[in-house]
Amino acid sequence: MYEGVIQDLIDELGKLPGIGPKSAQRIAFHILGADPSQVRRLAEVLLDVKERIRFCAICGNVAEHEQCRICADPRRDPTVLCVVEEPKDVVAIEKTREFHGRYHVLGGAISPIDGIGPDDLRIRELLQRLADGTVKELILATDPNLEGEATATYLARLVKPLGVRVTRLASGLPVGGDLEYADEVTLGRALEGRRQLDV
């Protein structure tokens, strides 16, 4: 245990997701040993992000303007909408360079244990986006866990009367993975989602 501002810094860093006490301590001592200009720049960037970044008025992704760059891009296919839980999921899908539609960020997943219900998510905004009939396919890309599955099922039932095609991301074995280490659910999904091998 340290005293004063050093311990305050360690405590604050430890509040960040994925940062445990040891990592917080390492980062704190890195900051202490860093050049003052680097520390000042880090502090400025943190403040700048908090002041300038907002959520896109259309999809809920992070943005510096009213619309994010994806919603503002006329080359994106407006007929395909990919629903994700968080902005970080948009980044993950964009890295594939395979998806050319638009997104809708829910801001989480249904989780009764955590007190998060449908009204706590951006589901009302999703329905408003679907109302004009432009979207023909809704891809549900929520996490493949209990909360993500519950959210996907809820949305699929909610959207069904609108006549929009609803699809779910395939799930299964990772590339380079070994079958013996796959859990039963993952292996079962991989079998369900199998496809013909064209040679």
Swiss-Prot record:
Keyword terms of this UniProt record: DNA damage, DNA recombination, DNA repair, Metal-binding, Zinc, Zinc-finger
Biological process terms in GO annotation: DNA recombination; DNA repair
InterPro entries reported in the protein's UniProt record: DNA_Rcmb_RecR, Hlx-hairpin-Hlx_DNA-bd_motif, Rcmb_RecR, Rcmb_RecR_Znf, TOPRIM_dom, TOPRIM_RecR
Pfam family membership, one: RecR_HhH
Organism phylogeny: Bacteria, Bacillati, Actinomycetota, Actinomycetes, Acidothermales
Parts of the chain that traverse the membrane: none
Family under the similarity heading: Belongs to the RecR family.
CDD domains xrefs: TOPRIM_recR
Native species: Acidothermus cellulolyticus (strain ATCC 43068 / DSM 8971 / 11B)
Gene: recR
NCBIfam families: recR
Name of the protein this chain belongs to: Recombination protein RecR
